[in-house]
């Protein structure tokens, strides 16, 4: 069995990383103030601003280090388990299992990340998403891919190109089909995020079990 950890950048982790940054700013500022007092004298006027700006920037490596440690030590509790003929989404309190030997409906789509100010996912990256439905069971999985990763993925698997309403360009395989808009809302509400490499493993697993998975973005 292969287990793919989901939602590694969960809300609790991001809050903890932000808190570590704030603590780092405070500690660096106080240490800087102590050193300044010993070397120059009391911190006044522009010195306060200089120390504050320096503390903000110097605390960023501390926050990144803390986030890296938390990624290892604090999983979200969600994971995708890949077994021969099966796919399981393990939640904190329950699990959802799909039998890949039976009929599974799926929809695959992607869209470009645009107009973001800061954040973990840069503008120009892509969200690649997949919704699997079997009876009353549904699973939404996704990953954020760089442009190079996106090109490599669509070379193997076609994805519906979900476009903004203001985008007038015509796409051979894309637009704003209602079923994909609905699937995107479900992804936003309850989807599980995977790392790009794990998303590739997921696609390969499904391609090995579902007929025509590599040929069409939906079934």
Question: Where in the sequence are the language-model features?
Answer:
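Hydrophobic beta-strand residues in large extracellular and virion-surface proteins
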Residues: 80-82, 87-89, 128-132, 141, ...
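Terminal and domain-flanking low-complexity segments
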Residues: 1, 131-219
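Conserved beta-hairpin
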Residues: 61-105
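Acidic, Ser/Thr-rich low-complexity segments on the non-lumenal side of membrane proteins
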Residues: 86-130
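Generic detection of short hydrophobic beta-strand segments and adjacent strand-loop junctions
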Residues: 2-7, 96-98, 139-141
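N-terminal membrane-targeting/pre-transmembrane regions
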Residues: 1-46, 188-195, 199, 205-208, ...
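Canonical hydrophobic alpha-helical transmembrane segment
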Residues: 23-27, 46-64
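Glycine-rich, flexible loop segments associated with nucleotide phosphate handling
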Residues: 50, 76, 117-130, 172-173, ...
């Amino acid at each position: 069995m292969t287990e793919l950890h989901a939602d590694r950048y969960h809300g609790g982790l991001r809050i903890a990383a932000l808190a570590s940054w704030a603590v780092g700013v405070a500690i660096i500022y106080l240490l800087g103030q102590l050193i300044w007092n010993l070397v120059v004298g009391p911190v006044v006027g522009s010195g306060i601003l200089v120390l504050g700006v320096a503390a903000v920037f110097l605390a960023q490596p501390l926050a990144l280090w803390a986030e890296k440690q938390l990624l290892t030590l604090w999983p979200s509790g969600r994971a995708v388990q890949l077994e021969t003929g099966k796919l399981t989404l393990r939640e904190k309190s329950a699990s959802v299992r799909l039998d890949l030997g039976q009929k599974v409906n799926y929809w695959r789509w992607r869209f470009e990340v645009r107009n973001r100010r800061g954040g973990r996912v840069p503008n120009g990256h892509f969200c690649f998403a997949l919704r699997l439905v079997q009876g009353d069971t549904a699973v939404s999985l996704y990953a954020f891919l760089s442009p190079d990763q996106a090109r490599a993925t669509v070379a193997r698997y076609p994805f519906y190109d979900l476009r903004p309403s203001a985008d007038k360009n015509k796409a051979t395989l894309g637009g704003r089909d209602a079923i994909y808009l609905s699937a995107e809302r479900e992804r936003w509400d309850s989807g599980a995020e995977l790392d790009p490499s794990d998303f590739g493993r997921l696609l390969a697993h499904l391609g090995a079990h579902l007929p025509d998975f590599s040929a069409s973005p939906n079934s």
